[in-house]
Amino acid sequence: MIGINKMIIQRTELYTTTGVVKSTIHGNIINISFNRNIQYQYRQISNKNKNRNLSPRVLNLKEKGTARVTKLNKNRKKGMRVVQKKDILNAKLNVQTPIVVEEIKNISFASQMVHKEHDNLPTLRSKQRMLLKAYFDQLRINNLKAVNNIFTLKKRVLNLKSNYLIVTYSPKGTKVNKANVLQQLLKYKQYFTKKWAFKLKARVTKTNFIKTQIALEKQKVRNIAQPCYISLNQKINKKLQKLQKQKLVLTSKAKLQRFKKQRYLFLKSQSKLDIDLLLIELKKKARQSKIKYKRRTKKKVKSVKVIEELKDFVALEEEMEAYYKTPVETIMSSIVTKYTENAKPLILKNLQQKLRVKEYLQYSQIRRLIDITNEKELYKNKELSKRNEKKLKKSIQQKFLKTVVIAVNHKKNQQKDSKKELIIKVLLNILRRKGEVPFEGKIDMVLPYLKELGRKQDDAKMNNLALNLQMRIVTDLLNYKGDTEVKNNHVALVRKRIDYLNYMSQNPRRSRNAGPRSDYKVIGKAKYQGKMMYAKLTEQRKMLENVALKNNYNILNNIIESEKKLYKLRLPKQRVTVPTLYQIYERVINHIKGFERKTQGVYSKAKKFQNILTKLQAIKRNKKGTIKKRRLKKAQEETTAPVTIPLTQGVLRITLKKKNMFLVLQNLSTKHIDTTVTARQEYYRIYNPKEIDPLEKKKKQALKLTALKPLGPIGRVIGTDLFRRRVITQVLLNLKAQIKYNVLDIEIRKPGFHSIINTILYKLWYIYEDQGLLRMYKFTKNKAHGSMRKKKHRRL
């Protein structure tokens, strides 16, 4: 990389709609200057707030009116001027460095404009530094190796005559790092980029491409026979190759717009409609029923190493070889052939159907735990599944023969019958226990046994679907054998949903706000709820073909009603039946082979078999052979809509997941940790500052316990969900919080001062179970502690 001397000046210009932002490097110092003519917005700061306890209250000027603006202009002691985030979004950058620098988003700098005659200048400068640290903490620039935590403001900020607001900071590290400070800062990228930022680049590439193409055609016509122009044509071909590469980069970035999910996706143009997020906004009722049910019936999932083959089968083969040497070999062979010929094809079909369901569930769980890019781990899982199929085929036959051999040898000494008669008696006794002998004279034991298996397998498939509520595919519902009307209605609605999504992707929205920063205007108002916003947008969509306002609104309501029916359909009220010997034996194999996975640690063989034996003993105690009907809990019944409680003094309760105790800033799609701060570091930084401060004391011993190595490069993705989490971390820093029984209780004494909590509760800043880690609970009034029965449920 290029080393920087004191004489060299490196400059970047950031063109926006309103003004220019510059930055220059003089040796160790970097100056970032903002134009004063940029649109700004006011934030109130109270004098009580000290030591980084800032709770700014954003004023939307369009809602409150211009009268508030004049007051704030007079009182400049309280009002401060801020470069708005809108102006820095999607800006075009041109840096004079060999490495390409990507675009900035979610960066907000702040500085305070004051009269010259103001007395307390040092106090103002201290406030300015605190604000800068707060905004740079949002970007996690403190964790960069090259940047120092110290920021200093120049005196030019206080002069109203100057046209620029200047911020300086001194980087820390070697010369190479000093040169790359700005690059490291700009590596905080984001997928979303607006149209107008790329059109400028696209136009330039098109015009250059056309000019070079015309020049080539002319040279090919004129200079066919002249060999001296060959070198010139080669140069032009290289230029064409570069331009084509630039096109590929632009198209790949444009494709990311379509596949990236965001909360207000249906407001943006050129994007598919994500109904799952929209349903949560429209109906809080459906959302609560989902969450409450998931907490109870969710399987604990974790990868477990597959145990080796059982040693019992080796001993069994030795017994069988010794047994077949006897002259009764001819008698046994006739029965064994009958069993294998009839049973093999039917057992294989049933096993394949079961293994398909298990593999589908297994791989859906592995995708969360393992990165799909690691092909080795997936390849291993495929090989293991093939081995397990072979083991199951062998084990069923050998287990059956083992039971027959043991029974015959046991009764041989007691009775005087021949071996053939003894074998028939043993087989009939096995079938009588299950009630599977229609006619006692016949020995056809296979077909009735497998007919019952086919029925019970259909029930097993439905139970597997009930456990995984995330599967919403039409093909999975076809296996259900129940109310045909309910099923057909849902299949039709799912097809309507797919057609609707395809139509919306072909005909994007063309609204009045469809310019740059359209979604910020809509979100800033926050007047309308989800229903009203959707109805408002459908009025603008009347001109499109084959879609009207009523059709759009009815489709969504039908989908909501169908999902309610679906949950009832997937969770039928049935009595629990006693499992057969085949099912019990199958469960034993599943425990051994590792199909059923658990979250915490690897259990030993003894514990697994002990759990199975306890279940078998409980079944034996029931004389009738039936387990009592399990009572449905109140959560499964239909609940009324929740009442919005106003903010008062009390406790805000938030439940935390078991895996990650606090905030883990991690994308599930890319598996990259967004920042070096992990769950334990955040926990210790907020709740145990005296014991460990890993961000300040950068020691190896402290970081070994807390730090996790990031999987990706330094530059990582920042999304809207992450931005919301950081807002919540600011709330937790400002308020008194306490963790107990995986529940985080936040005390609120003066609700008027905490405007961010209003936004969390009333603007629906929820963080979902899949994407985020917090879940908002109800807001009680001075009732932090419930009954002991509730506390036991929280200790999961």
UniProtKB/Swiss-Prot annotation:
For this record, the Gene Ontology CC terms, alphabetical, are: mitochondrion
* Primary location group: mitochondrion
Q: Which domain of life is it from?
A: Eukaryota
**Alphabetically ordered keywords of this record:** Mitochondrion
What compartments host this protein?
Mitochondrion
Comment field (misc): Found in a 14.5 kb cluster region located downstream from rpl11 gene and upstream of orf796.
Instruction: Quote the protein name from its UniProt record.
Output: Uncharacterized mitochondrial protein Mp36
Q: Which organism is it from?
A: Dictyostelium discoideum
The gene is DidioMp36
